[in-house]
UniProtKB/Swiss-Prot annotation:
Residue ranges annotated as motif Cx9C motif 1: 13-23
Localization per record: Mitochondrion inner membrane
Protein name stated in the entry: COX assembly mitochondrial protein 1
Mitochondrion recorded as keyword: yes
Gene: cmc1
Length: 104
């Protein structure tokens, strides 16, 4: 069984699709004359599907890697920002402590 055959969607297999369609117009389809073309088409469609799946997996891995890198960058930026805020608060508290000592 194969998916709906569309020359536009399965461009790599277009010649085989056309050949099978032509073969099916004759009575040879009832006597197995189209079987060879059908098997070649099935192999072509399988290869096409596997190639697309491989590309999709590679793209997903790349997207996942980019997302992970962005997440790590955001974590680093957040740590830096948190450290700066803490340093500023420490400076303020030290300045307030120093100002309090001068008043006594």
């Amino acid at each position: 069984m194969h998916p709906h055959l569309d020359v536009n969607n399965q461009k790599q297999c277009a010649d085989l699709i056309r050949a099978l369609e032509e073969c099916h117009k004759s009575f040879g389809k009832f006597f197995g004359e189209c079987n060879t073309i059908k098997y070649e088409l099935k192999a072509c469609l399988t290869k096409d599907r596997n190639d697309k799946a491989r590309l999709n997996r590679e793209n997903a891995r790349m997207r996942k890697k980019v997302i992970e890198e962005n997440r790590k960058k955001e974590e680093i930026e957040e740590r830096i920002l948190t450290d700066r805020i803490l340093q500023q608060e420490r400076k303020k508290s030290h300045a307030n402590e120093g100002a309090g000592d001068n008043n006594n």
